[in-house]
Curated annotation (Swiss-Prot):
PTM sites of type N6-succinyllysine: K379
InterPro entries per record: FAD/NAD-bd_sf, FAD/NAD-binding_dom, FAD/NAD-linked_Rdtase_dimer_sf, Glutaredoxin, Glutaredoxin_euk/vir, GSHR/TRXR-like, Pyr_nucl-diS_OxRdtase_dimer, Pyr_OxRdtase_I_AS
Sites where the protein binds FAD: 158-187
Gene name tied to this protein: TXNRD3
Protein name as annotated: Thioredoxin reductase 3
Enzyme nomenclature, EC number: 1.8.1.9
Keyword vocabulary terms for this entry: Cytoplasm, Developmental protein, Differentiation, Disulfide bond, Electron transport, Endoplasmic reticulum, FAD, Flavoprotein, Methylation, Microsome, NADP, Nucleus, Oxidoreductase, Phosphoprotein, Redox-active center, Selenocysteine, Spermatogenesis, Transport
Gene source species: Homo sapiens
UniProt-listed PROSITE patterns: GLUTAREDOXIN_2, PYRIDINE_REDOX_1
Cofactor note: Binds 1 FAD per subunit.
Record carries keyword Cell wall biogenesis/degradation: no
Chain positions found as Asymmetric dimethylarginine: R26
Sequence positions bearing Omega-N-methylarginine: R26
Additional observations: The thioredoxin reductase active site is a redox-active disulfide bond. The selenocysteine residue is also essential for catalytic activity.
Amino acid sequence: MERSPPQSPGPGKAGDAPNRRSGHVRGARVLSPPGRRARLSSPGPSRSSEAREELRRHLVGLIERSRVVIFSKSYCPHSTRVKELFSSLGVECNVLELDQVDDGARVQEVLSEITNQKTVPNIFVNKVHVGGCDQTFQAYQSGLLQKLLQEDLAYDYDLIIIGGGSGGLSCAKEAAILGKKVMVLDFVVPSPQGTSWGLGGTCVNVGCIPKKLMHQAALLGQALCDSRKFGWEYNQQVRHNWETMTKAIQNHISSLNWGYRLSLREKAVAYVNSYGEFVEHHKIKATNKKGQETYYTAAQFVIATGERPRYLGIQGDKEYCITSDDLFSLPYCPGKTLVVGASYVALECAGFLAGFGLDVTVMVRSILLRGFDQEMAEKVGSYMEQHGVKFLRKFIPVMVQQLEKGSPGKLKVLAKSTEGTETIEGVYNTVLLAIGRDSCTRKIGLEKIGVKINEKSGKIPVNDVEQTNVPYVYAVGDILEDKPELTPVAIQSGKLLAQRLFGASLEKCDYINVPTTVFTPLEYGCCGLSEEKAIEVYKKENLEIYHTLFWPLEWTVAGRENNTCYAKIICNKFDHDRVIGFHILGPNAGEVTQGFAAAMKCGLTKQLLDDTIGIHPTCGEVFTTLEITKSSGLDITQKGCUG
C-alpha cells in the first residue's frame, strides 16, 4: 500500500510526530544523535574568519555529497513535518539537529549567509536549496520535489545560462573556472528592420560600446573646431563620413564578439546559438535559426536575457522607424532625424547625431531623463538646445507615414499634444524610437516552471542572492526588478552569483551607490541619490547641498561658454555631512565620477573632500573647494577657470 504524505502544515500548527522530543523519524539519518554533542568546525576563536570559512566549506561539502540534507532542530514541529514528508516518500535524509551540536548557532549563521534563510528547517535536495517547511510542501505539491528526488538523477549541465550578454557571460566564465559544466544559450531575435548581432549582448553590440565610440566621434568634431584657437591650421573642408565610422566601429565589435567566443571555448563553456525556452522543471528547449530543436537539462539555471527597445504601437512604427538596435550598424547616414523619447539613450543618440552636423529634433512626452536628478537633466537639455538640438516638448507621435523610399527615405510624422488637442506634423529622413526597453522574459517558458514576473514590466523579482521564487532558477542583469540597468552591475552580480552557487564565496552584489554617466555632448556623471530622492528619504531640512558652476581650462582659449558646467554634492547634515549624492555636468564626467564613487563606498564626507588637495587644473578638483550651499542663495557664477 502506498504511504500518504502528511498534509502541508497550517500556520502555527505543529501536528503529531513520532518522538517529538528529538524530531527523529524513520529514514532520517541523524548526523548528531542525541546524547553526543558534535563539533563541525575546528576549535579555536569562535568568530575567527578561518574557522568560519572552514565551517562554510564543511557545509557546502555536506550539501554537495548528500541527496537530501535537512538542517533542523529536534524540538521544531515544522522540522518534524518536513522529516515526516521525506519519510513518507521513502527518502533517506541527512539530518543535522542544530540544537544538538556545539556550534549549532554558528552553523545557522553561516547557512543564512549561504541561503538568505535564517530559520529551520532548511532543506537541500540534490544540491538545490529548496527552502523551509512551506517551500518544501509547495515544491511537493507542484511536482518539483519529486523531480529533484528522481533516482540516479543526472543532468546534462551543472548550470545553463539563458542569455549571452554581460551578466550571463560573467556568470558562465566564473562557474567554469570553479570546475562546473556550463552552457550558454544565446539567440538574437532580429529587430523589425532585420538587424541582428553576435555574442555579447546589448552593451557590446548595440549599446555602451558603439554609443561611446560615436560620442567620441562627435567630440573629435568639436575638438577640430577648438583646435584653430590653439594654432592648428588646415585648409581642407572638414566633414563627417558616416560609412567610414560605422565600418570601423562594426569591425571593432566583431573582434569583441570573436573574443567572447574564444574565451568561452578556452574555459570549456558550451556555447549554443539557439533560443532557450523552459519546457518543464530543469529542462529547456533550444531552437536554432533553422527551427531545429534540442533539449538540455541542468541542476541550476540563470536567466540573463536582457531587454529590447519598446515600440509605440502606432501606425508605421515597426515598418518605418528604427531603434538603437539598428542605428549603430545603419549602412547610410540617417540625415534629418526625429528622436522620440527623453531617456538617456534618446539624448545620447541625439547628441552625437547633432555633433556630426545632422538636423536633429527630440520629441519629449514629459520630462528629460526620468529617474535622474531633474536639475541636472534640465541642464543637459539646455546645453544640447544651445548646440543645435531642437526639442518638441509635450508631444507624442500618433502616426508615421512613408513619403519616399531610400537610404534614407522620407517619413511624415503626425504628433499630438499631451496637454490639449493641438497636432503637428513634420518630415524627416529617419525616426529613431528611444522610449524605453522591455524585459525579454515573456516568451521563455517561465510560466511552465512557475517563475514569477512583474506582469506589468516583465521584470523578475529576486531576493538578495538573485534567486527567483523557484529555488534552482536565478536571474541577473537588466531584467531584475528594482535594480540598476547597467553593464558593470550585471557583470559583478553574475560573477558573485556563480561564486555563491558553487561555494567559492558568500559575497553579495552591492546595488547601493552605483555610479553612472549619461554620455550626452556635455557628459553628466552621478552617484548616489538625486536631489529629489534625497529630499524624499531624508527631508530637506536634514540636507546641505553644495554646488558651483565651473569653467574647464581647455574651454577658455577655445572661447567656449563659461558658467555651463556644474557640480553638486548632497550631504546628510546629521551623519557627519556624509555625501549621499554626487553630480557633475562637464567634460569627461564619467572619468571624474568613477573615483568619487569609490570614495562614497568608503563613507565620503564633506570634511574629507575639504581635506583633499585637488589636482590642478582639472574639472574634478572643483569638489575639493565647494563652499556655497543652495540654502545660502549666494551667486555661484565664476569669473575664471580657477574660481
